[in-house]
């Protein structure tokens, strides 16, 4: 099954997708926030184009599992997404996905400008990979 991964941010949101078999994740695009309506129009356009079976969203938590302001912002984003799409939504705890993606890109020799263009997509890839590594019976969509 194909999934779409999201690394949500208040300025930039990274999007990644899996192959049709749901085995490998690939960076897809970065959506730059302008207005909420424009953001969701672009996101839903990608969803329509990719036709995933579900959407996987990274949920940033502190090391001890505590929630932060960005955690609440992600939860609000997920609530708005669920009002606009009937696809199942999965949350995956993520720590440092953007930081680690940035480090990987720096080590690969990308300039700051090049890293800025793709770091959120790479973070979305990491989120999808975390999801794909879960046993099938632990991939539980949000209810309600």
Curated annotation (Swiss-Prot):
| CDD domains listed in its UniProt record | YqgF
Enzyme Commission code(s) on record: 3.1.-.-
Its Gene Ontology cellular component terms are:
cytosol
Transmembrane parts of this sequence: none
Keyword Nuclease among record annotations:
yes
Annotated InterPro entries: RNaseH-like_sf, YqgF, YqgF/RNaseH-like_dom, YqgF/RNaseH-like_dom_sf
Annotated keywords: Cytoplasm, Hydrolase, Nuclease, Ribosome biogenesis
* MF-aspect GO terms: nuclease activity
SMART domains, alphabetized: YqgFc
The alphabetized list of GO BP terms reads: rRNA 5'-end processing
**What is the first-listed, main subcellular location in coarse terms?**
cytoplasm
Record's subcellular location? Cytoplasm
Q: Which family does it belong to?
A: Belongs to the YqgF nuclease family.
Checking PANTHER family in the record gives:
POLYNUCLEOTIDYL TRANSFERASE, RIBONUCLEASE H-LIKE SUPERFAMILY PROTEIN
Q: What's its job?
A: Could be a nuclease involved in processing of the 5'-end of pre-16S rRNA.
Name used for this protein in its record: Putative pre-16S rRNA nuclease
What is the scientific name of the source organism?
Answer: Oleidesulfovibrio alaskensis (strain ATCC BAA-1058 / DSM 17464 / G20) (Desulfovibrio alaskensis)
